[in-house]
Design a protein with these regions (language model features):
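Short Lys/Arg-rich basic patches
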Residues: 1-9, 22
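Short amphipathic alpha-helical segments
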Residues: 8-10, 18, 28-39
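Solvent-exposed residues in well-ordered beta-strands and their adjoining turns
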Residues: 11, 62, 103-105
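Short, charge-rich, low-complexity interaction segments located
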Residues: 34, 43-50
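Short glycine-/aliphatic-rich beta-strand segments at the starts of folded cytosolic domains
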Residues: 51-62, 97-99
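Non-DNA-binding regulatory cores of transcription-related proteins
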Residues: 69-127, 131-132
């Protein structure tokens, strides 16, 4: 994919906000920051549709909570067509972190994440999506 140069006219306040964004996120230049913002916008537009996206559901939970491991596995098996892989990490004697790599329609991934995150015993979790 080739690079196309173009000029942009902005109000001073907007330019200052862009420069603050560049600095805060350690972009090497404004072009990289604008590219990142456009990519983020494009990805978010895909979330609002039935487009295919990829992502990860990351959860932290107490594995001593009665039957939580089985409940998580059951939800995953019910949606196996969306799950590419999982990684289970023991953070402490009681607490586990699980990363579930997913791919499918954005609304299906959101529904899957909601089912997992609503299980009793999940301390925290988040769905992160990007374009597939």
């Amino acid at each position: 994919m080739g690079v196309v140069r173009f000029g942009v006219s902005l109000e001073k306040e907007t330019m200052d906000e862009l420069d603050n964004y560049v600095t805060a996120n350690k972009f090497p230049n404004r072009s990289q920051a604008i590219r990142n913002l456009i990519e983020k916008y494009a990805v978010e537009q895909k979330w609002n549709c039935d487009n295919e996206v990829a992502g990860a559901i990351v959860i932290v939970y107490d594995h001593h909570k009665r039957n939580i491991d089985n409940e998580i596995n059951e939800v995953q098996h019910d949606h196996h067509e969306l799950i590419l892989s999982t990684q289970h990490v023991h953070l402490s004697h009681e607490t586990c972190l699980e990363s579930i790599v997913v791919k499918g329609k954005a609304n299906e991934l959101t529904e899957l994440a909601d089912k997992i995150l609503s299980l009793k015993g999940i301390h925290h979790g988040k769905l992160i999506m990007t374009r597939a």
